[in-house]
Curated annotation (Swiss-Prot):
PANTHER family: LIPOCALIN-LIKE DOMAIN-CONTAINING PROTEIN
This protein's name: Pericyclase pydY
Protein EC: 5.-.-.-
Entry keyword annotation includes Mitochondrion: no
Lineage, uppermost ranks: Eukaryota, Fungi, Dikarya, Ascomycota, Pezizomycotina
GO molecular function, one term: isomerase activity
Pathway: Mycotoxin biosynthesis
Top EC class for this record: isomerase
Family: Belongs to the pericyclase pydY family.
Keyword terms: Isomerase, Virulence
Protein function: Pericyclase; part of the gene cluster that mediates the biosynthesis of pyrrocidines, fungal natural products containing a macrocyclic para-cyclophane connected to a decahydrofluorene ring system that show potent antibiotic activities toward Gram-negative bacteria. Within the pathway, pydY is involved in the late Diels-Alder cycloaddition step that leads to the formation of the decahydrofluorene core.
Length: 185
């Protein structure tokens, strides 16, 4: 289902489901990130519901970003909350190891300097893209992930464009999500 035009990252609390027919294979990316084989296979078979919430913190004025991955069948999900301030946050994630994550609003100009693939086809404008940079400290890899909106065959979708670099190896992929609707609260 199309993401409505009035849904943006400036102030949202909405959910999306993976559109496998429009997604690229994540196998190379997950391998480069050190994901075990069995987890890579599960990731390619399970359709995760994604919830994204953004809001302005009344005390700091910063935009906050909450990302939830909810797999089916009662499997454990993952939730992460960040300020869009690009201040590093270190954490350990099962199957990915020690990470240093920075999150901010992204612009096409900034993203093109990293890799022209990142902003390709995405809607441009203020607050239209969120850039998450993840340093994989255990394996010396860097992932740039862009959350945005893209029109594909006349339909507006939530899209993530991802570039992973590990040494001289580079993986690029696009994940596409169908809009499931607003969330309460």
């Amino acid at each position: 289902m199309a993401t409505p035009g009035n849904v943006t990252f400036k102030n949202t609390h909405d959910s999306w489901g993976m559109n496998w027919g429009l997604c690229d294979s994540s196998e190379q990316m997950l391998t480069m990130q050190g994901m075990p084989w069995i987890m890579r296979k599960l990731a390619s078979w399970i359709s995760v519901t994604v919830v994204i919430k953004t809001w302005t913190d009344p005390e700091t004025g910063e935009t906050r970003f909450l990302l939830q991955h909810n797999p089916p069948m009662g499997l454990p999900g993952m939730s992460e909350e960040r300020a869009l301030d690009y201040v590093p946050d270190e954490l350990t994630v099962p199957n990915l190891g020690k990470l240093r994550v920075r999150t901010r609003w992204g612009t096409a100009k900034e993203l093109d300097q990293l890799d022209k693939y990142l902003a390709r086809g995405l809607e441009k404008g203020p607050h239209s893209m969120i850039h998450m940079m993840t340093e994989h400290l255990d394996i010396d890899a860097v992932t740039h992930q862009i959350f945005g909106y893209e029109e594909i065959d006349g339909t507006r979708y939530h899209v993530r464009r991802i570039v992973v670099r590990k040494g001289h190896e580079v993986a690029r992929l696009r994940l596409v999500y169908n809009y499931l609707g607003p969330r309460a609260g």
